[in-house]
Amino acid sequence: MYHFCRKERRKNMSIFNQFITTKESSISGLTDELKAIYIQSRYQDNSIVVVTNTLYEANILFQRLKSYTNEVLFFPMDDFLTSEALAVSPELKTTRLETLYSLLKKNHQIVVTNLMGYLRYLPTKKVLNNKIISLKVNHDYNMNELIQKIYSIGYTKETITSVTGNYSTRGFVIDIFPIMEEHPIRLEFWGDTLDSIKYFDENTQKTISSLSEIKIFPNTET
């Protein structure tokens, strides 16, 4: 059986509860293909969160829905999760974070999750938005304060930045591999002024391209 909810805006609730409504429905007795077709048809005018019993069922439905629409997101959580196992599945965590920040950008989407994912405590949109770091070239920032903020939003310091969720520093340079990005970025400072923002290859450490601004999304769900 699948359970799904339709959208209605609410304040001071988690991002999922702001995204959906109390109008809830359950469907059963359909093939996986028909479930995907039915959910996609209901999505035309409403945002939907679909809750399955297990992660396996959620993944199957997500893959089916992707063949009908690009407006589908996945929020996976281990079915038998304990507090000691929170860091066991970094790939699932990255997928969850990408889904949360996609919802910040665009409300009208389908979200597929399993029961444990739906029960996961999540912050409000306001809390998530307040943790995003926005940087622009030729603007002034206190480098030490910026490093502290990067650490506070879930990034791990390493000697070399090559994996999503890591950052490193040397002199007036901060390297960071933000979630939602295919490559890490290099922040080069001249004093307190952000002199350049560049994508670089995580393997060769060579510059790929420059950009004028960047948003660094938190690497944490809380």
Model-derived regions: residue spans:
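ASCE RecA-like P-loop NTPase motor cores
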Residues: M1-T222
